[in-house]
């Protein structure tokens, strides 16, 4: 099966072809430079850029791959959660292509696709316990199979990625700041007491990073030397040696606080599974963070479980994961009609496919049992 994937959920415009379990080709246009001027994603600009770039990217994809739309067996598109205006651009394109060609349309849960990115090209054993960490979501998910999911815990306010982004703003780091915090903290021993490990004094698997955001902002306000305007330009590229040691230690300490918080909750969930999972999975943009990847590798080694992490390029938003998830869904007989709707961030993505085997899989954004 050859599946076309379309990703426009936030600020990456991407299209990809995926065939028989392997990516064929992806074309991606990043908007990072556009939004860097504003210190974050501007939704109106993001949707306009998707509209401008999506058509040429599709043309470039088919030209470079030697394939045509006639070769495609299914059309998959990210339907949410994400920025509503951005999602609508991708959905409009996918619906138009489906209507014109008669090819099946598959709306893909963006979070589900992130988790399945860790399985691309790998024979992952199920059930698996998954950790999804991104700019907008932090979840612990049990995967009975690739298409059967149960959310065990999620963030009650801010996600881990949001904590990284807001901390970067507090320290006046360039956008996207999470990458700077990761790189600047490398090789520096963290001060393990500098920042709190939030929301651990409970007995469930949910997260809250709002308190950590406040702690970092307070620390930055008390140390204005870390927010000097010149810091944003120091070193040009990410050259850790060009940045003040005090800032690097703060970044290392923040990496530790977030990684340790994730570890404690993830290990708590692992201990309370009805049966031991066969695999561990982690995915999402924050899963590219070095200390978090190292923490997960250590946890997996201690538990004697295989750990599956996406390649760094597949941690960020991309169309390969949308096409891969769409392929699995299409092969199982799932599809949508043209009434498919976009689901903005903060809303549950419904499992409203037509066809497929009996029984439903839970949405990846379903409510946590702890709420």
From Swiss-Prot:
Compartments it resides in: Cytoplasm
Function of the molecule: Required for the formation of a threonylcarbamoyl group on adenosine at position 37 (t(6)A37) in tRNAs that read codons beginning with adenine. Is involved in the transfer of the threonylcarbamoyl moiety of threonylcarbamoyl-AMP (TC-AMP) to the N6 group of A37, together with TsaE and TsaB. TsaD likely plays a direct catalytic role in this reaction.
GO molecular function, one term: iron ion binding
GO biological-process terms attached to the record: tRNA threonylcarbamoyladenosine modification
Full protein name: tRNA N6-adenosine threonylcarbamoyltransferase
Organism: Solidesulfovibrio magneticus (strain ATCC 700980 / DSM 13731 / RS-1)
Cofactor requirement: Fe(2+)
GO cellular component assignments: cytoplasm
Cofactor binding comment, as recorded: Binds 1 Fe(2+) ion per subunit.
Family named by the database record: Belongs to the KAE1 / TsaD family.
Record PANTHER family: TRNA N6-ADENOSINE THREONYLCARBAMOYLTRANSFERASE, TRNA N6-ADENOSINE THREONYLCARBAMOYLTRANSFERASE, MITOCHONDRIAL
E.C. numbers: 2.3.1.234
Reaction equations catalysed: L-threonylcarbamoyladenylate + adenosine(37) in tRNA = N(6)-L-threonylcarbamoyladenosine(37) in tRNA + AMP + H(+)
UniProt binding sites for Fe cation: 110, 114, 317
Domain of life: Bacteria
Pfam family, one: TsaD
UniProt keyword Acyltransferase, yes or no: yes
Keywords carried by this UniProt record: Acyltransferase, Cytoplasm, Iron, Metal-binding, Transferase, tRNA processing
Binding site for substrate: 132-136, 165, 178, 182, 289
InterPro entries, alphabetized: ATPase_NBD, Gcp-like_dom, KAE1/TsaD, TsaD
